[in-house]
Amino acid sequence: MPILNRAAEFQQEVSEWRRHLHAHPELLYDVEYTAAFVAEKLKEFGIDEIVTGIGRTGIVGVIRGRGESSRAIGLRADMDALPLDEIPGRPWASTIPGKMHACGHDGHTAMLLGAAKYLAETRNFNGTVAVIFQPAEEGGRGALAMVEDGMMEQFGIREIYGMHNMPGMELGTFAIRKGGIMAAPDKFSITVRGRGSHAAEPHKAVDPIVIGAQIVGGLQLIAARNANPLRSVVVSVTQFHAGTTHNIIPEHASISGTVRSLDEGVRTLAEQRIAQIAEGIAGANDAVAEVEYERACPVTVNHPEETTHAARAAIDVVGAANVDTDVDASMAGEDFAFMLQSRPGAYIMIGNGDTAGLHNPGYDFNDEAIAFGVSYWVRLAEQRLTD
């Protein structure tokens, strides 16, 4: 089954929805305008049930098929934007300063709406499709909020599927893998407390800058010497702040960064070693290191059987030559991981073509991907809910 003719027919309409959402970006849980737009469209499609306020501002639409099966699957799209100023020029560019859809969640929402429209028209499946529109993917754990609100139980969801666009991947292609596909994106901060002095009298100081520099160097040993080289981990220091002027050794310095891992054991190792290295180096130099470590999201782990189902649906749409079933994992993070911890499922990438990268002020979702995404969602739902 290639691209659905019906999906191709209303691609322009879905593109118009996408561009409308792009012009009205909202952040985290504050997606009231977007959620209202989604709810209105679902109502127009005549779906069976629309439930709002799940995970604060999330929406679930229920589409029942022709048969009597109680089986239900969930298809998820994220709705929130990013705190960026968009490079102007497009007629549908953001109308809200400091906010833009730089990760393609406008496209994700529009594609799932397109699939909902098609599924509500045809209902060529036996069971229930729950179309899930999630807030706060960008750092707000919106997926966890929806899970903790009892979404899976309320709608009887047995399997859950997600999709994300990928700049640099050709249009009309998909990519997926079994196991970890997205990393756990953790954060750490270190405060080094020493003793300040005049810069001309360094012997009277316990210099947090020199000590902090040693800590930064020591952290590189985690990936280079502590972790199994066959289990990927990234430890990146991204901020180092200290001092206010040129002739004073400050009393403290702050260091922060991120850890990315695809293995829970390596993740725990990195957390432990950051504390040991920072506290050990500081203590050896008569200073104190205070370490905070925040686990943001788990590793996004695709379940084997559901990954096979997702790949099969993609192959039916674009052909086997255009589906990479063993793509390299990404060290970016994704809170869909919480849904995959709650139910078996899979997360797939869809090609966005040669566009600016994600989280870039020049990025835009490629509307030419819409028909592929809508067709994938429809094919997946119909395959998983056959008699």
What does each model-identified segment do?
Residues V60, A81-M100, D106-G107, L112, ...:
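Histidine/acidic-residue-rich, glycine-tolerant segments that coordinate divalent metal ions
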Residues D48, I157-R158, P344:
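Conserved acidic residues
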Residues V210-D387:
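Metal-dependent amide/peptide-bond hydrolase catalytic core
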Residues G74-R76, F188, Y347-N352:
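Non-cysteine beta-strand/loop elements that form the S-adenosyl-L-methionine
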Residues I63, V192-G194, V259-S261:
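Short beta-strand-to-loop capping motifs
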Residues M1-H101, D106, A110-F125:
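Acidic/His- and Gly-rich active-site-bordering loop/insert found
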Residues L21, G61, L75, H105, ...:
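Divalent metal-coordination and catalytic microenvironments
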